[in-house]
Amino acid sequence: MHEQLNFSTGSPVKIKWCDYDHFKYPLHFHSEYEIVYIIKSSGKRFVGNNIEPYLEGDLVLLGSFLPHTYKSDPVYYQNNPDFRVNAIVLQFSKNFFQYAIGNYPEFYKVKNLLEEAQYGIYFKSCKETDSIKNKLKKALNLKNIDLLIECIKILSLMSTTENKELLNEDYFRPSIR
């Protein structure tokens, strides 16, 4: 399913707090990049051809047009208020950094990160990823230029950490017809 995201404010960055009884999105893709931070939930994460369990603290960066979905564990479908999905999702336009990446050396590592994101990137838990997660929580309360700046800081941290792994071995792009 191709998801068309609405950036109603005209901003290239969108952040949302997710509070669901279980994940409800089918397998989908969109042109925007997406950072998903699972605060509370467990289940299976589907990214391209990769299927792996996810737990609380899971942090991934998904590239443009990379198919993905999350399937909650069965306990989340039993209407138990103790089992809820809480997550932060930060989405940004693939054109957001296009000029800066091509013209400023300060964005070289971010450019490499976004190229790697086409495979899906899982960030292993460590001090650096804790800092990224804290910045995502902070970003929930930001708007306008402050949100844009925080997004750049988050991507900068992601680009410098060594504690990450690609989720797919091959570049995965769905056929759009």
Regions found by a protein language model. Name each.
Residues 1-61, 65-66, 73:
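Generic protein-terminus/edge-of-domain signal
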Residues 121-127, 140-177:
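Short, Lys/Arg-enriched, Trp-marked, Pro/Gly-tolerant hinge/linker segments that flank
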Residues 2-7, 66-134:
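A hydrophobic/aromatic-rich effector-binding and dimerization subdomain
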Residues 27, 52, 102, 143-146:
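Short, surface-exposed helix-loop/turn micro-motifs enriched in polar/charged residues
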Residues 24, 46, 99, 140-143:
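Generic anion/oxyanion-binding catalytic loop in active/binding sites
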Residues 38, 112, 136-142:
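Juxtamembrane/interfacial segments around transmembrane helices
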